[in-house]
Amino acid sequence: MASSIWKGLVGIGLFALAHAAFSAAQHRSYMRLTEKEDETLPIDIVLQTLLAFIVACYGIVHIAGEFKDMDATSELRNKTFDTLRNHPSFYVFNHRGRVMFQPPESEDCHRNQAPFSSNSSLKLSKLEAMHR
C-alpha cells in the first residue's frame, strides 16, 4: 500500500498544477484587457507549472510500486512449455464437432427421429388449439 506521504505529495502537485493553470488563465485575461497579447507568461507561473509537474510525477512513481522488467524472459522463466500458450478459459466443449463427426449410423437414427417427434408435437398442439 502506498504511503500517505506520497499520496499527499501527489495531491500537492496536482493542486499546484491547478493553481498554475488558473494563474495562467488570469494572466491571459489581464493581457487581453490591457491589449498586450504578445507577451509571454511570467517566469513564476512557468516555474510553478514545471515544479508542480515534477512533484506530481515523483509522487505517482512512488505510488505505482515496483516496475516490471522490459524483457519478457523474467515473466517466462517461471512458466513451463505446457502452460505457455495454454488458456483453459478458451476451451469450448459444446460445439458442432459432436454432430459433424458422428458415425453415419447414428446420424441416420437422429435424422429419422427428429422430424417425427417435431411433427407429432406440432400436430398435437394444433389439435389442442382447435378443441379450445
UniProtKB/Swiss-Prot annotation:
GO CC, alphabetical: early endosome; early endosome membrane; EMC complex; endoplasmic reticulum membrane; Golgi apparatus; Golgi membrane; membrane; plasma membrane
Molecular-function GO terms, alphabetical: inorganic cation transmembrane transporter activity; magnesium ion transmembrane transporter activity
InterPro entries given in the database record: MMgT (IPR018937)
Subcellular location: Endoplasmic reticulum membrane; Golgi apparatus membrane; Early endosome membrane
Record topology, Cytoplasmic segments: 1-3, 64-132
Disulfide bonds: none
Alphabetical keyword list: Endoplasmic reticulum, Endosome, Golgi apparatus, Magnesium, Membrane, Transmembrane, Transmembrane helix, Transport
Membrane topology (UniProt): Multi-pass membrane protein
Transmembrane segments: 4-22, 44-63
Any Gene Ontology biological process: tail-anchored membrane protein insertion into ER membrane
Ranges in the topological domain labelled Lumenal: 23-43
Assembly and binders: Component of the ER membrane protein complex (EMC).
Function text: Part of the endoplasmic reticulum membrane protein complex (EMC) that enables the energy-independent insertion into endoplasmic reticulum membranes of newly synthesized membrane proteins. Preferentially accommodates proteins with transmembrane domains that are weakly hydrophobic or contain destabilizing features such as charged and aromatic residues. Involved in the cotranslational insertion of multi-pass membrane proteins in which stop-transfer membrane-anchor sequences become ER membrane spanning helices.
Family membership: Belongs to the membrane magnesium transporter (TC 1.A.67) family.
Protein name according to UniProt: ER membrane protein complex subunit 5-B
Organism placement in taxonomy: Eukaryota, Metazoa, Chordata, Craniata, Vertebrata
